């Protein structure tokens, strides 16, 4: 969708520029008063996909370039430290952070570790492994010394409560966590007919293979909130959200609609929607996940 692509390009650029204006102010104040500083955003990505087919409608990477002048400006583009030729939507991998919590919540509900109505009194700091020197904190506790109180899974998603997902993610375990991430297509090829990287879900084998360091339970806790070694592409995250929205079906992110003859008189190939995986779980689970995500925008 060319029109949507243009709108998304403008929206992403405007959003990043707006954030950088605020960050420039923070940096200036930090230099003047010695307060905590920040960094400017050098790039970003925006993906829009069709929920019921997985078809990408817009794939935006920022900064971008003008295709009409790319050859003339190629050396300049290559030398640009912000890498405008780098397709962040398909090639960039980033820690999903709290956007991964709906995946953890899916696993918790599907495996029967929690029910939708089960509540947990959150305590801010998870101290189960404090004797091992590890006691992670919820963001609200680290920042304000508050807790989220007694909450259920819908509220835990809405308020992005780290403690809730530390507590139950510890019981879930990394293997089940990784299993549901795979069903959602996280760390997997999307099916798009363009070069892409897959990233990876944090697992014991990945950490030990690439770092030579043994897995410890803190890695499981961090994985439950989308950290540790977990990195996915923006397109994978968009397809994952589409699967949540449509009730658990992950489609191929194909951008090929059809192939026609040279004179357009015949359709030689017509693409059909392809299902890559499906979460065969209680359909009501997706309703709770959706409600929690809705609350991020309208209730949090």
Across the structure, where does each feature detected by a protein language model lie?
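Conserved, well-ordered alpha-helix/loop/beta-strand core segments that scaffold catalytic motifs
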Residues: 1-34, 39, 43
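Beta-lactam-recognizing serine transpeptidase/beta-lactamase-like catalytic domain environment
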Residues: 26-39, 44-98, 103-300
């Amino acid at each position: 969708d060319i029109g949507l692509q243009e709108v998304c390009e403008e929206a992403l650029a405007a959003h990043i520029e707006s954030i950088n204006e605020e960050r420039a102010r923070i940096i200036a104040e930090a230099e003047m008063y010695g307060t905590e500083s920040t960094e400017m955003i050098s790039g970003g990505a925006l993906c829009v996909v069709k929920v019921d087919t997985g078809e990408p409608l817009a794939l935006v990477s920022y900064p971008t370039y003008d295709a009409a002048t790319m050859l003339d400006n190629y050396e300049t583009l290559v030398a640009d430290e912000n890498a405008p030729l780098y397709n962040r939507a398909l090639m960039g991998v980033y820690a999903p952070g709290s956007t991964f919590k709906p995946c953890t919540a899916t696993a918790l509900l599907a495996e029967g570790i929690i029910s939708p109505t089960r509540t947990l009194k959150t305590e801010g700091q998870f101290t189960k492994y404090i004797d091992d020197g590890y006691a992670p904190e919820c963001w609200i506790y680290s920042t304000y010394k508050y807790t989220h109180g007694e909450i259920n899974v819908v509220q835990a998603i809405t308020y992005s409560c780290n403690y809730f997902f530390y507590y139950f993610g510890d019981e879930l375990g990394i293997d089940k966590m990784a299993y549901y991430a795979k069903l959602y297509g996280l760390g997997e090829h999307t099916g798009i007919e363009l070069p892409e990287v897959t990233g990876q879900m944090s697992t014991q084998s990945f950490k030990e293979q690439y770092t030579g360091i043994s897995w410890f339970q803190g890695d499981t806790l961090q994985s439950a909130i989308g950290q540790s070694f977990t990195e996915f592409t923006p397109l994978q995250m968009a397809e994952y959200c589409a699967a949540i929205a449509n009730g658990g079906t992950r489609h191929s992110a194909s951008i090929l609609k059809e192939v026609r003859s040279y004179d357009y008189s015949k359709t030689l190939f017509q693409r059909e929607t392809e299902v890559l995986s499906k979460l065969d779980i209680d359909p009501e689970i997706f309703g709770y996940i959706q409600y929690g995500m809705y609350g991020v925008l309208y209730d949090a």
